[in-house]
Amino acid sequence: MMKHILKYILIVFLSFVSGRLLAQEASMITRLYDTFSENLVTLEVDYSVKGGGPEVKGKAELQLQGKAYHIVGGGYDIYCDGESVWIVDQTSKEVIIESLTEGPEGYVTNPALLLSRLDEFFDVKSIAGRKYTLKPKTKGEITAAEVAFSPEGKLVSGVFTMSDGNAWTITVNKMTMAPQKPLTAFHPSVRFDKSWIVTDLR
């Protein structure tokens, strides 16, 4: 479950920076989009999942550079170099390797698709101040979404409602920027020797 939580954190994060979806705030979104396109951006977030079972809470750190990203939280590391995704469980010494996925559900296995193609998956249902309610164009895991900005155009929060009834809430506590780094920095740093269970689905 935790690996899915971390992926949806990234989905909410990327939903803020689509340069085309929120046309009503074009100048602010364009500036934010350019910032993410030209820098290595680090986010520190809190997340919670509410639904049929006990509430799940936690913290995570995300780094994004173009379509590459690295997420750390809940005992998992998720790396993506823009072509492949590594889901690493350091405790159990297991790793799953996946190729990026295209199509309407591609954002589940490749949330980076939202950076440039969110408008292919969602429509803006309503706008209230700096809060945007989004509606998916096709039936899938996400049934509704709501994202919000600060007056300065910074990321604030996002809530995604899932088809299983769970509601995912993400709050952005801190955002920093740094110069871009080589894409090899988005590969796992650990060597997967014989002590690891490796599932390569590419």
What residues fall within each predicted segment?
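Bacterial N-terminal signal peptides that target proteins for export
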Residues: 2-9, 19
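Hydrophobic h-region of N-terminal signal peptides that target proteins for export
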Residues: 12-22
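N-terminal leader/targeting segments and the immediate start of mature chains
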Residues: 20-56, 65-67, 188-202
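Non-transmembrane domains of secretory- and envelope-associated proteins
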Residues: 24, 128-130, 138-144, 152-202
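Short beta-strand segments that buttress and anchor functional surface loops
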Residues: 45-49, 70-74, 131-138, 157-161
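An acidic-aromatic
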Residues: 61-108, 168
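Short, solvent-exposed coil/turn segments at beta-strand boundaries
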Residues: 62-70, 79-84, 127-129, 148-156, ...
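Flexible, surface-exposed loop/linker segments and immediately adjacent secondary-structure boundaries
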Residues: 100-130
